[in-house]
Amino acid sequence: MLSVEALEVRYGGYLALSDVSLHVAAGEIVCLMGANGSGKSSLMNAVSGLVTPAAGRVTFDGADITTVPTYRRLARGLAHVLERRRLFSYMTVRENLLLGAYVSAMRPARAETLESVLVMFPALRDRQSQLAHTLSGGEQQMVAIGRALMSRPRFIMLDEPFLGLSPRLVIQVGETMRRINAAGVTVLFTEQAIQQSLSIADRGYILESGRLALTGTSAELLANELLQRVYMGLDGATAIDDGADAARGADGAAVEEKEPR
């Protein structure tokens, strides 16, 4: 469904992604993991059209969308929930949600789609007139995901959906992602916590300093000795940040476990 081939992203002279390739099949939940600055958000921004790759190709449903404008990618069924939610703080919950249905083809079905979103997030039903900035972090995340669902996507990307949430809310958001997937929407999300992410995802990719370091099914990654030793540590810690420095060799180069070309 989604393929990224040899992607390179630059911000001026800074190389954020180098030669990154991945594939997400229809119906999957796939997690993109890595420490802060590893390139996770840059990859998602390139897929949704918020940044233009310096090299490489992005295809969606077999069509090359590398240079397609963001709004047209949305119309094709590709939605993106940005890191830190990015709601309109002084607009109501309802107003924020309805903005997700601005694509002309979705407007006639706004009422029906809004009802389906409120069924998925019942806590928002009685808060539709509440200003977004007065919501808790978990409620704001519900609004951000609901706004993306208003476009009726077939593929949704969530950038760090657990950021700043309590353990209880992390579980709730994870369950929501499974429900979205069960409804026929393919899911790609980013996260730093490995065990937590792989308990939700079918497969995962790990980025290190803008390059692909590891990939495999959730079971394969959890059983991988390099991942256990470098990223998770002997105590089973889940944060990739803890192992980021150890994942570099003596010369500072990232340790990668990929098949040679």
How should these model regions be labeled?
Residues 48:
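Helix-to-loop junction immediately C-terminal to a conserved catalytic motif
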Residues 12, 68, 93-112, 120-122, ...:
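ABC-type ATPase nucleotide-binding domains, specifically the catalytic core motifs of the NBD
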Residues 33-35:
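The feature captures the beta-strand-to-loop junction immediately N-terminal to the Walker
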Residues 52, 64-85, 107-114, 126-129, ...:
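ABC ATPase NBD coupling module
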Residues 148-149:
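ABC ATPase C-loop
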Residues 152:
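Conserved catalytic motifs of ABC-family nucleotide-binding domains
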Residues 131-135, 139:
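Conserved ABC ATPase signature
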